[in-house]
Swiss-Prot record:
Residues 38-201 form the Phosducin domain. One of its GO terms (biological process) is flagellated sperm motility. It comes from the Eukaryota. The gene is Pdcl2. GO terms for cellular component: endoplasmic reticulum. It comes from Mus musculus. This is Phosducin-like protein 2. Its main location: endoplasmic reticulum.
Length: 240
């Protein structure tokens, strides 16, 4: 179908006979600016204000505006509360053993809590703390805490460290005990993020396990070794 705004002789004839409407002229920058200013003028002044500014300027509005302001203020307040609730945490906090029950087991309803039991003398624990600090900032809706293991469990063996527990509504929904379960000595941030997302503690945007590629390479290498071993065995048999 032919574009009615296209500059063709046929379209011009149709315009002259009134069959097509006059061609729309492109708006220049000044006209665009005027339109934008007109649209901005239609916005009520209070719609650009913060809650604090609304409080200071409320004497300057008429009765009709005040009613609208109350509705608008309530809307802004609810948006602010929702944002604060979502961004409630945002850091890896240190707690002691006597805070465990209140901070972890009895945390508020439907809240995910990730706790890391650690010792500073265990290098892998320091790696996990570093990764959890990053994840706490990335997922502020989840509570991330750490505690020196001696303050929570006496005589806990170093072989069981790092230990990560994931709680929700007082129940352990996931646990990673020891270096292997936590992801190995070369644990990457994305790998720990994947582990926590698998148990539901965070909503990650990772689409697959970051370690999958490494695992596939290892399987491929093992298969290649097996093939070479088979070829070698066959050659030895023929030689005999």
């Amino acid at each position: 179908m032919q574009d009615p705004n296209e500059d063709t002789e046929w379209n011009e004839i149709l315009r002259n006979f009134g069959i097509l409407p006059p061609k729309e002229e492109p708006k220049d920058e000044i006209e665009e600016m005027v339109l934008r200013l007109q649209q901005e003028a239609m916005v009520k002044p209070y719609e650009k204000m913060t809650l604090a500014q609304l409080k200071e300027a409320e004497d300057e509005f008429d009765e009709e505006d005040i009613k609208a302001i109350e509705i608008y203020r309530e809307k802004r307040l609810q948006e602010w509360k929702a944002l604060k609730k979502k961004q409630k945490f945002g850091e890896l906090r240190e707690i002691s053993g006597n805070q465990y029950v209140n901070e972890v087991t009895n945390a508020e309803k439907d809240l995910w809590v990730v706790i890391h039991l650690y010792r500073s003398s265990v290098p892998m624990c320091l790696v996990v703390n570093q990764h959890l600090s990053v994840l706490a900032r990335k997922f502020p809706e989840t509570k991330f805490v750490k505690a020196i293991v001696n303050s929570c469990i006496e005589h806990y063996h170093d072989n069981c460290l790092p230990t990560i527990f994931v709680y929700k509504n007082g129940q352990i929904e996931g646990k990673f005990i020891g270096i292997i379960e936590c992801g190995g000595i070369n644990l990457k941030l994305e790998e720990l993020e994947w582990k926590l997302s698998e148990v539901g503690a965070i909503q990650s945007d990772l689409e697959e396990n970051p370690k999958k590629g490494i695992a596939d390479m290892m399987v491929s290498s093992i298969r290649n070794i097996s093939i070479y071993d088979s070829d070698s065995s066959g050659s030895d048999t023929e030689a005999k």
